[in-house]
Design a protein with these regions (language model features):
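Small/aliphatic-rich secondary-structure junction motif
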Residues: 3-49, 53, 58-66
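General small-molecule cofactor/ligand-binding pocket signal
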Residues: 36, 67-71, 129
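Active-site loop/turn elements of alpha/beta-hydrolase fold enzymes
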Residues: 38-40, 73, 133
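Charged helix-capping and loop-helix junction motifs
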Residues: 49-53, 81-86, 113-117
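Structural beta-alpha unit
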Residues: 63-98
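Gly/Ser-rich helix-loop-strand patches that form or flank binding pockets
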Residues: 90-134
């Protein structure tokens, strides 16, 4: 069913839960997994942190021998930039499933802050699995 699964990670607990779901699905369908992290700028600190996040995520996949790709996507600052960078990565890599974590924001906080996951739904044609925090 799914052959190319992309998981967006940012080092948060909910991203770890999304990664676990992505690994499980990739293992079930013998799919290739692409782990993507958005970096916000040209500075080395952002790139180094992005690489650390990806390497940590990759170590989680090595245990199950899931074929994995790592990708740092450069994003403009702000939620739109992150969603745009992930959407571009989805199209470039031709992912057929995207797995992302989503917070449980409600009310005014959700209105003002928004959601990368929400924006992805509007930007991509691939299936999206939203993983809520437990």
């Amino acid at each position: 069913m799914y052959k190319r699964i992309m998981v967006a990670v940012d080092g948060s607990e909910i991203a770890q839960q999304a990664l676990a779901e992505g690994i499980n699905i990739a293992n079930t369908y013998n799919a290739t997994l692409c782990i993507v992290n958005c970096i916000g700028g040209e500075n080395d600190t952002d790139k180094n942190k992005g690489n650390e996040i990806l390497e940590k995520a990759k170590s989680d996949t090595d245990v199950l021998s899931v074929e994995t790709r790592l990708l740092n996507a450069e994003a403009e600052y702000g939620l739109n930039g992150i969603a745009d960078a992930i959407a571009a990565a989805v199209y470039d890599w031709k992912a057929d499933l995207i797995v992302v974590g989503t917070s449980n924001r409600r009310g005014l906080e959700r209105f003002y802050v928004g959601s990368v996951a929400e924006q992805l739904v509007a930007k991509v044609d691939s299936s999206i699995l939203l993983v809520r925090s437990k």
